[in-house]
Amino acid sequence: MPAPLETCLSDLDCASSNSGSDLSSFLTDEEDCARLQPLASTSGLSVPARRSAPTLSGASNVPGGQDEEQERRRRRGRARVRSEALLHSLRRSRRVKANDRERNRMHNLNAALDALRSVLPSFPDDTKLTKIETLRFAYNYIWALAETLRLADQGLPGGGARERLLPPQCVPCLPGPPSPASDTESWGSGAAASPCATVASPLSDPSSPSASEDFTYGPGGPLFSFPGLPKDLLHTTPCFIPYH
């Protein structure tokens, strides 16, 4: 009988030792969990803190970036305002210079036309020729004088060809040999003061070269009706045929 009792006691001891080891292992697991919980809590707190640190630093950097952007925008706006003001001043100065040039040009043109009117045959005092009328009349006047001199030299033989071509009252108007006493007097002024220089205006005489091109008038009289000019000379001379 003693042998079975010993075996039972040994079995009980083994079982108790096994249960103690199980309890010890269970206790150790609980202790491990209890130990791990504070560690996890501390690590969880540290991780958000670490994550929140960049957000705080980024939040601190955002106002600085906004300030820089605002400063850049302000600078751009100032540059635009300055450039617009500069462009406005440049345009104004260019406009003023252009107006001055145009004013000077018109003054010079009017002075030249006045000088041209002074050498043309005289009109009544109340007559005022426009610019285009002055130019046409000067063209016709020069053309008539040139044709008269050319026909006098080529068409009629003899030394007194010009005197026979022009009327007697216009003979003193012809230019003579230059003399030192008459250097200050021009032939144009003498022609303007003489009665032979009363030439019709291109507007009043539609058969003039320039008026025939610009106006649709019918055929009129001769261009310059000199009293001593032969009537058939204007019709037989080739240079006068286009102006009939």
Curated annotation (Swiss-Prot):
| Spans annotated as Disordered | 43-84
One GO cellular component term noted in the UniProt record for this chain: perikaryon
Provide this UniProt record's keywords sorted from A to Z. Answer: Activator, Developmental protein, Differentiation, DNA-binding, Neurogenesis, Nucleus, Transcription, Transcription regulation
Q: In which tissues is it expressed?
A: Expression restricted to the embryonic nervous system.
- Which PROSITE patterns does its entry note? BHLH
Q: Which Pfam families match?
A: HLH
Spell out the molecular function terms from Gene Ontology. Answer: chromatin binding; DNA binding; DNA-binding transcription factor activity, RNA polymerase II-specific; E-box binding; protein homodimerization activity; sequence-specific double-stranded DNA binding
Keyword Transcription regulation in record: yes
User: Chief location of this protein?
Assistant: nucleus
Description of how the protein assembles with itself and partners: Efficient DNA binding requires dimerization with another bHLH protein.
User: What this chain does, per the record?
Assistant: Acts as a transcriptional regulator. Involved in the initiation of neuronal differentiation. Activates transcription by binding to the E box (5'-CANNTG-3'). Associates with chromatin to enhancer regulatory elements in genes encoding key transcriptional regulators of neurogenesis.
Protein name as it appears in the record: Neurogenin-1
Gene that specifies this protein: Neurog1
